[in-house]
C-alpha cells in the first residue's frame, strides 16, 4: 500500500495524526472484521451486482429516448435533435461502493435547458415510466426539498433526481466536478447536483479507497445496530458517516480498517463540538452561491455538530442534529472507544461492538406516536410527512422543558393486527444537572398540541390521516415492538451494555446512601390505581380520544421524576480538543473559557495506549452558541428560529490525546433511566366538536413531589 509520505500527497486540512503502517495484529483483526461484515450479509452477490449494472444501462436508455421525444415535440432543429442527450449519474452508497443487498440506487438525470423539471421530468418521463411493465411502485415527489421520483426497475429500487443545465446539448463526457456547471442553475438543480459532486469529492480526498470502503461499511452497520443512523430523526445519515470516516482516513492514511474504526471512536469521542469537520478548505467560489460560514451567516452558528460537505457550495450536512441526539451519539462513541480498547487486550470482539442497542430496555417511559391512513398510498405520504416533523416534537419538548431528554427511535413499527397503522417511539429521561423544586409541575399540553396542529396542517392532508400521541411505560410496551412480536421474559444479560449498567449500579450503591428509587417507583405506580395499563396495552383516556374518533384530541400525562446524578460542566472536562478547522475565527468573539466546574471524583479512565502526536493547528471554539433550531409553520407563522443558548465549556487544542474518561456523572451508560411517569384522569372534551389549539391541551405534567424523599430529605 502506497503511503502518503511516499507519494508526497497530503490529504485534509491538517497533517495526519499518525503515519504508522499496519502490524500483524492489525492484519488479523481487519480480516476478522471483513469476515464479520460478510457473515452478516453486507455484501451483494455477483449476480445482483450485474443486475444493477444492467438496470442502470436500461435507465440510461430510457432518459435518452425521453429527451429525443420532448426535443422533437418542441420543434428543435435537426442538428439539436440529433445531438439531444440526457445522462445518468450515480451517487450515495452505490457510488461510494458501500451499498448492500437490496439497497436503493441514488441516481441523477442531467438534461438540457429545454427539458424542464415540472413539465417534462414530472410530465413526459413520469408518463413513460408509468406505462412500462418493468417499472413498479412509481412515486413522484415533486415538492420535496430535492425533487425526485422513486420506483423499481426490474425489481431494483431507484431514486431519480433531475438537474436541468443551461446547455443545449449534454455531452457524454460531462464532468460534474467543475464549478462552472453550477452557473445559472436554479436552486433545485444545485441541490440535485450536490449529491454527485460531494460523493466524487470524498473519493478524491481519501488516501486509500478500499480501506475507506471497508471502514465505512463497518460504521454504517454499527450505526444502524446502535440506533443512530437516521438523518431525519436528528442523528446522522449516510453522507454524514461517509464524511466522518473520510476524515479519519485522512488522519491515519496508512492504517488498516481495524485501526480506522478504533480511531474513529477515539477522535470523535473527544471532539469539541461545535468545531466543524472539514475534508478540505472550503471554497468560497466565484458564482455567489451561499456557503456554510458562521462568521457571516448567523443561522450557521446554531449548528451544534457541523459536518461540512467538500464540494462547492459547501454546506452543513448534519443540521438536523439536536442537543439530545448529539449527547446520545457521544455516548455511543464513548462505548465504541471502550470496546475497541478492550479488543486490543482480547477482552471483547467485533460481536461486542455490534451488539444492538436495547432501546426498549433503556428507558422506563416512552412517548408513542400512532398514525393511520385510509389506504397504502395515503399512509406512505402521511408517514413521510410525520417523520419529517417528529424532530420538531423532540426539540419543542426539550426547549420548553429543559429537564427532559428525548431519545427518538429512528424507525417506525407496524402492528400486523392493525393494517394501515404504524407507531413511533421516543424514550423519555430526566435531564441531568437541572435543579428542581419539590412538587413543581410543568404542563406541556400546548407543546404536544402545537406539534399535532403543525402535523395536521399538512397541505396534502385528507380525511383518514390521523395521529395520536400518548405516554406508555416500559412494562406496557406493545409486543409488536419486540423481535418476532414476542416480549422477552427478562432484560438482556451478558451484553456489554448490561454489564456496564450493573457495574455502574454496584459502584453507585457502594458509594451512596440507601437508594429510595424503588420505593419511589412503587409508590408512584400505586397512585395510578385503575389507570394502570393492562395486558400490555397503552393507556386510554376515554372513547372520545381514540385514534378513529378524535385523533386530534389530547392525551393527559403526568411525569414523576426522581433525582438523578447531576453532570457538571463538560462531559469530558480534562479532554483537550483535537479539532482542526480552516475557519479559526468563526466564533462570536474568538475567546475561550475554562471549565467552570471541577470534574467529578468518580471519573474512570479507560485509555491504555500511549498518546499520539497531533500536529494539528490550534483553533478557538465558539464561546456560547450551542443552540437548537425550531421551525414553525402554518398557523404559527412563517419559519421561526428559536434558540436555546447555554454556556459551552471550551477547551483549546493540545498536542496529545489524553486518557479517556467516563461521562461526568460517572455513568458509562448515558441512557440509565430512573424516573416514572403516571397518568392523571381528566375531563374529556366534547367529541362532537373539534376543539381549538387553546382548548385541546393534553395535560402532560412533570411532578417532582418525590424529589425530597429520593434525596433523603
UniProtKB/Swiss-Prot annotation:
Domain of life, per UniProt, equals Eukaryota
Q: Which Gene Ontology cellular component terms are annotated?
A: nucleus
| Free-text tissue specificity from the UniProt record | Expressed in stems, cotyledons, hypocotyls, radicle, leaves, and, to a lower extent, in roots (including primary and secondary roots as well as root tips) and flowers. In radicle, roots and leaves, mainly present in vascular tissues.
Q: Catalysed reaction(s)?
A: RNA(n) + ATP = RNA(n)-3'-adenine ribonucleotide + diphosphate
Q: Which UniProt keywords apply?
A: ATP-binding, Magnesium, Metal-binding, mRNA processing, Nucleotide-binding, Nucleotidyltransferase, Nucleus, Transferase
Give the EC number(s) under which this enzyme is classified: 2.7.7.19
Q: Where is this region: Disordered?
A: 480-555
Q: Which organism is it from?
A: Arabidopsis thaliana (Mouse-ear cress)
Coiled-coil residues are none
The residues that the entry says bind ATP are 91-93, 103-106, 159, 229, 238-239
Q: Which InterPro entries match?
A: NT_sf, NuclTrfase_I-like_C, PolA_pol_cen_dom, PolA_pol_NTPase, PolA_pol_RNA-bd_dom, PolyA_polymerase
Subcellular location, record wording = Nucleus
The record's annotation in Pfam families points to: PAP_central (PF04928), PAP_NTPase (PF20750), PAP_RNA-bind (PF04926)
Q: What is this protein called?
A: Nuclear poly(A) polymerase 1
Q: Which SUPFAM superfamilies does the UniProt record give? A: Nucleotidyltransferase (SSF81301), PAP/Archaeal CCA-adding enzyme, C-terminal domain (SSF55003), PAP/OAS1 substrate-binding domain (SSF81631)
